[in-house]
Amino acid sequence: MKSTFLFALFVLFLAASEAATDYPTNPPTTPPTPAPTSTPLPSSAASPELVAQLLNAPSELDRIKLLKDNQFVFDFKNSKLGVTQGTGGKTVATSRTNFPAVIGHNVAMTVGFIEACGINLPHTHPRATEINFIASGKFEAGFFLENQAKFIGHTLEAGMATVFPQGAIHFEINMNCEPAMFVAAFNNEDPGVQTTASSFFGLPADVVGVSLNISSIQTVEDLGKHLPQNPAVAMQACMKRCGFSD
């Protein structure tokens, strides 16, 4: 497991150094353009049959024979695979279905292209620990692991990295006036992701109401309808400081 995670870290730094080379650094002159949806963009994917064959291959040699050469490359900059778009930027994530070469290696990766004042909303990865490397810009990031644990928060600049333990609620905020990028590596090819607020409001409304000490079911339902898309636009103070709002 240690060697697998060290490999993930090596890939993370290699990908980040390459991707950061020509990532735009000029401050935007207008606010980020809102996106119509945060659902993954349409993409082709490995067939369920291929995924099953790779998972059940008797050896690594057999697994490699099942893949074409181009299936060992994933283009985070231009890919339409694994993309989630919001008002505050986009994240691009590999998975078994969109990057089948990871199957059997216990690694996965997500790259976040976060706009000025954007936030990768609080979320968890139920099946993986994350190491997050800042490729460009600067982020405020933090996590909360469990009841009675303390909140851990950091300001991370380009070239720095942090760890989010498996299952911890965590976030990344770009509080600056220009785009920023992070590269997240995982020690599981299927790390999973659960956005905290949307998952919470997906529970029965009366359960959510009791949890928030709100007696009105209608109020709970109204709150759930106005959750931001991920990545979202962050605090209004940042928008005002950057000249994006009055």
UniProtKB/Swiss-Prot annotation:
A matching Pfam family: Cupin_1
Keyword Manganese: yes
Extent of Pro residues compositional bias: 25-39
Entry-listed glycosylation sites: 213
Occurrences of domain Cupin type-1 (ranges): 74-220
Gene3D superfamilies: Jelly Rolls
Residue span of region Disordered: 23-45
Signal keyword on record: yes
Keyword terms, alphabetized: Cell wall, Glycoprotein, Manganese, Metal-binding, Secreted, Signal
Signal peptide stretch: 1-19
Binding site for Mn(2+): 123, 125, 130, 170
Protein family (similarity comment): Belongs to the germin family.
Miscellaneous information on this protein: Spherulin is a major encystment-specific protein.
Protein name: Spherulin-1A
Annotated organism of origin: Physarum polycephalum
The organism's taxonomic lineage, starting at the top: Eukaryota, Amoebozoa, Evosea, Eumycetozoa, Myxogastria
